[in-house]
Amino acid sequence: MEQKLKVGILGATGMVGQRFISLLENHPWFEVVTVAASPRSAGKTYEEAVGDRWKMDTPMPEAVKKLVVLNVNDVEHVASTVDFVFSAVDMSKDEIKAIEEAYAKTETPVVSNNSAHRWTPDVPMVVPEINADHFEVIKDQKKRLGTTRGFIAVKPNCSIQSYAPCLAAWKEFGPKELVVTTYQGISGAGKTFKDWPEMVGNIIPFIGGEEEKSEQEPLRVLGKVENGQIVKAELPKITCQCVRVPVLNGHTAAVFINFEKKPTKEQLIEKLVAFKGFPQEAELPSAPKQFIQYLEEDNRPQVTEDVNYERGMGVSIGRLREDTMFDYKFIGLSHNTVRGAAGGAVLCAEALTAKGYIAAK
């Protein structure tokens, strides 16, 4: 790419916005030129607006420190400065729906980390390794919006990243039923231990809205395109409990699974480690070389050892074994703010760029 695409971050001061800025530092295709946030941050430099709330392990990139924060509601102005935007705004669902459509209608593609449009029939919800073919509904979405280049694409919830890829890898065996419990790090709530001290040594057995997303969203990712819309898959049936645990980054899933055609353990592992998709074939900049790793040790995957596998863009699976009530059980782990949030959205944007949906204005 001769000239980098100009990128704006909507909701740039929050945790996911910060992760976008951190991941996009020195990106070969994209350059952050605009940061937008709430009216109270507007007019300040990015450094001033974030203040002591920078939550990343790496320092704030020099290139963004002096960018003046724009008001995210000033849609025309923000859109005029960029080729496309990443959305991580913190608003009500209806407000997010409206503002993302408003940006799309300025002919600015929107790649969103938010849940507001995940069930809009002509908005693709994509894990690029699994369902990059769903991008084809964008042409129908553009007709609805009356745009030529503006559209919305979203990524699914962070909680499903540690088991949904397995379902795609094992498709030929017909995953039929899943019982899942997720153990989710506190960064998923936009927090650190500094600002959520009551999570130290604690477990909270409820995360609002998360169980429904964890049960339903994999079916949309595994669905198919029909008549310009995405029709969700019928199977597998999924039941899920989601638990907040005292870990900073990383979502772990304990999964029990039944298949229509029960495979051997060796077949399952072989399919996992061989699984690849469009990002690997196209050698996208953020793509993990090996999307899924299988760990043989009994005590893996562990957050401290494995959450940053493939720079946080890969998925780690372990403890696959036969079960007395189900066919198999296993443990999965993914990085919730990299693969599960900003990193997954960056990979989506790379896939959209490689396929010609995003280009310079």
Features from the language model and the residues they span:
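Charged docking surfaces used in two-component/phosphorelay signaling
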Residues: 187-361
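N-terminal Rossmann-like NAD(P) cofactor-binding subdomain of oxidoreductases
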Residues: 1-205, 237, 309, 315-316, ...
